[in-house]
Structures are given as C-alpha cells and as structure tokens.
Amino acid sequence: MKSKNKRVLILGGSSDIGIEVVKDFLNMNWDVTAHYFKNKKKLKKLKNKKLKLIHANFMKFNEKNTEKIISKKFSKKYDALINLVGYVDNKSFENTNLRSIIKTVKINALIPFLIEKKIVNKMLKQEWGRILNCSSIGVKFGGGKNSYNYGLSKHCLEFIPNRYKDWANKNVLINNIRIGVTRTKIHKRMKKNLQLKHRLKLIPAKRMAKPQEISSYIVNLVLDKNSFMTGETITVAGGE
C-alpha cells in the first residue's frame, strides 16, 4: 500500500503522543483527520493543508444524539483509525463511584467503539483498513493509585470483537497497544511523585518513553508493514 492519498483518523489527536502521531503521518503525505476536545492550538501550529480538525466532546454524547453526531462528524472513509483518547479523573478505587466510572468508560472506550463500528464497515468495503486502540500498562497493574477509572476504561477498550477473524479476510486488522510511562504532561507533573520514581526503577532503561518513540510503534502497526498481526495486544513499556 502506498501512503499517497491515504486517510487516517486520530481520536485524541491533540494529546502529547497524538501530536507526534499526527506529524508522522503528515510527513508520510497521509490525509490526517485529528479529533480533539481541548488543545486545538497545538494542532493548528502544525499548519498543514493535509490536516483536518474535528472537535467533539465525548462527555456530551448520550443515547439520543450519539448516532447522529457520529454520522455527522465521523462518516468519511478512512484507511486507518487510531484511538488515543485518554480522559483521567484522578479517582482511586476507594473514592470512585458509579457516575465517575460510567463517565470515564464512556469517553475512553464506549464512544470510540461506536466510531470504530461506523468506520470498519467502509474499511471492509474497500478491503483494507487498520484499527489501533491505545491502552495503558496500568491495565496490567489494576490501575494506578489515582487512576482506577482510567485503567478500568482502558481494560474495556482492549476488548476486541470476535468478528476481527472475519475482517482479516478483507485485510482489515485491529490491535491494541499498551503504552507504558511516557514523558507527557500528566507524568511530568508526577515527576516528584514517589510512586512514579518507583516505577522508573522497574524499567531497565530507568527512564520514561518519549512521545516520538511511542508514535513510531503506533505508526508501524497501522501501515501495510503490518500485514499479518490482528487481534493482539502489544505492550510497549520498556520492560516494566
């Protein structure tokens, strides 16, 4: 597959990792649609004619408007879909409640699932597509001290429908990537946190990943370089 005129949708495109993924695809001459909730300025600074921005607040999606919004905003054909949405509410297991759990799972997993459901049908018709859901190494540890809801939502996100086996016959592949501790705004604020210092000791390289490093793994999993792997969860966490 040649990258010319190929289209990718990146959910959570204004995140630190998302920005790097956007830049990597633009450098390969892909048409990039980047979804964002906040941080529009970071995306606009890229100033590229091949970059289109879509604003959507997943918190405002409900049973009445979800299908309508998805049809309006996410109805185009895409060759690749990458979900980097990552809402964190800083809730511990002890302090969580039904409302906060539902909110986090809806934003990080349920709405992205429904968007994927819409887009995968068009991928099947064109007989080519790549879907990658970006999860967290926190799933492995039952979530962090103050990120229980986030970890739970990412655990839900890793649930791949068994239809992926049929999709492979149409060259549509779907995978998850568990991302480890990365030098993003959230972890920068936690730098002095004792829990984070302990986690860095568990990583052989004794450091956080760079967003650019994570982006390279993400990009490779949705290019035609990956012509075989599907239904898998790949961990990129530096050995933690």
Task: Tell me the role of every PLM-derived stretch.
Residues 14, 22:
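N-terminal Rossmann NAD(P)H-binding glycine-rich loop of SDR-like oxidoreductase domains
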Residues 84-90, 239:
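Conserved NAD(P)H cofactor-binding loop of Rossmann-fold oxidoreductase domains
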Residues 92-93, 100-105, 199:
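Substrate-binding pocket helix/loop in short-chain dehydrogenase/reductase
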Residues 130-156, 161-168, 181:
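Catalytic loop of short-chain dehydrogenase/reductase
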Residues 171-173, 229-231:
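Short, small/polar-rich loop/turn modules that mediate ligand/substrate recognition or access, typified
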Residues 203-214:
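A conserved structural motif in NAD(P)-dependent oxidoreductases
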Residues 230-240:
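Short C-terminal tail/terminal secondary-structure segment
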